[in-house]
Amino acid sequence: MRRISCFLLMLTLLLTTAVVAWGTVPTDGEVTPGLVNVSRSKTATVLDKDYRSTVTLSLPSAEEKLASDVVFVLDKSTSAELEDKALKLLADLQKEVTNRGVMVKVGVVIFNQAANVAFPLTELTEGNYATIADAIRETISNGSNTHAGLLAGKEMLDDDTAVEPHRKHLIFVSDGVTYQFCKEDDYTTPYTRSFDGSLNSDGPNQCGTLSELNVQYEGVETSIPKGSIDNWMSDIAGRMRTDNDNEDWDYQYTGQAPTDNSKLLKNKENVSNVEKALHLTESTYKAMQESGYQCHAVLAREIRQWGTAFMNRLAGGRAVAFDSIQHKVLYAVDKGSTVADTVGKSFDLVPGTFCLTVGVQELQYKQDGNVTYFGGDQNESNYRFKIEYDGAADSFTWEINEPVSNFAPVKLSYTVKLAGTPAAGTHGVMDLNGDGYVDDTTTHVDVSKALYTNESAILTPVATDGGQGEALEFPKPSVSYTAAAYYYSEPPAPVKRTVSPTTFDAGIAVYVEVAALSLAGAVKLCGRRGRRDA
């Protein structure tokens, strides 16, 4: 009988997931007031016994806390109309808090010659809504220090380390006209500068007020110095780097000329109080943008042409409506955004496994050939989301047909399966969060060894103000598995017995002898039987 020995070593499956939240994947390009980045993540589950993994795309990131900060920095002269729009945004945020159970913190700064914290950054509740509304309506007078207002707002946002930077919003409402500034981030004490009265054709010193600009430039009440706001701001920055700027000229604002004549500006090329105030305001605004905060500049009213132009410059060269800000605070991306996802070369997408949820609600779907519709009537003319699969390329396009809420992540899941027969040995690299490091280590992932569930997944976002954002790449989860080979061994060969001729002959002789005796006995027995019968 043939013996077959089969040995099987145990299989060990290891898989990783990868997640990239907005802000953790670096993006190139200048920070702008528009769509800067979009929170997003992509994860994969551990391979099961059939070498399958569930991949999940999420907008915003599934790992992100659904908490936001909103700080209003309001000019003392903010109109009642804009205050009402701010209150409408506040009411909508209150609905999100009530309906979705999310956390939104709100702060209010009112500024004149200094910044006044009318309401510290506090979690929005039904109980404090009225108090916040009163803070927004608060009126004060005397002075205009935009730098102070932004410093106070920035401090609020900086101090809250529990909220992701891109979920921090600063809404700056001003006419852009300013002539006071602060030193060493102290937003409670205003400073100014003043030209020597001899430079003023009218004679008297202007006491560090807005009128100092009239000493420096002619016709400034109806025009922009240097021909445009961009030229002027560039010129100011250049002079700030020369001896046309000196901190010794700064003095605490009192409404009077400096008591020390050495502080008086003697040259019209010197950086004036208005110019330094504008420069520091813009620098603080940009610093917040570079920190990832979403800053929104809204023109409160038109007083001076250069003030209006300055606010539009902060807003990216365009006027910003309060309604568009409200949309940005509430939503991550708008209708028309798409995701193009290509499955990894080592995997195949498993048909019929798409699943989509909004918040905690799983949407109904209908599959029509290679197209799957989610939500609405689930057809080509009425759907919330659509997925079109390309079998030849093993890729799909996800179309988003509604704004995606910052407070209710949209998650698309599907299953991939390892293509072909698992090869013996260890393959892939564990990278559960897609940060480029092997899980639970500080070791960089070797991309040549990674086993990516996807070749790529690209988000092409539409901003909430309708603008087209730059393409953003999702992370690529990498998985790992270890499989043993099957071993087969031939059965042992039969033992061949060698019989010598002598032994063989003796054996035959014995056999013949025994046979002969047996035969003789049989004959004898037969004879006896025959006689008895007779």
Kindly give the residue locations of the regions a language model identified:
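Low-complexity, intrinsically disordered segments enriched in Ser/Thr together with acidic residues
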Residues: D390-T453
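Acidic, polar low-complexity linker/tail segments
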Residues: T24-V71, T78-D84, Y488-E490, P494
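Von Willebrand factor
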Residues: E63-E123, G149-G153, E164-S174, T178-Q180, ...
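C-terminal membrane-anchoring or membrane-association module
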Residues: S518-A534
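A surface/secretory-pathway sequence property marking extracellular, secreted
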Residues: V106-V108, T122, E126, K345-D394
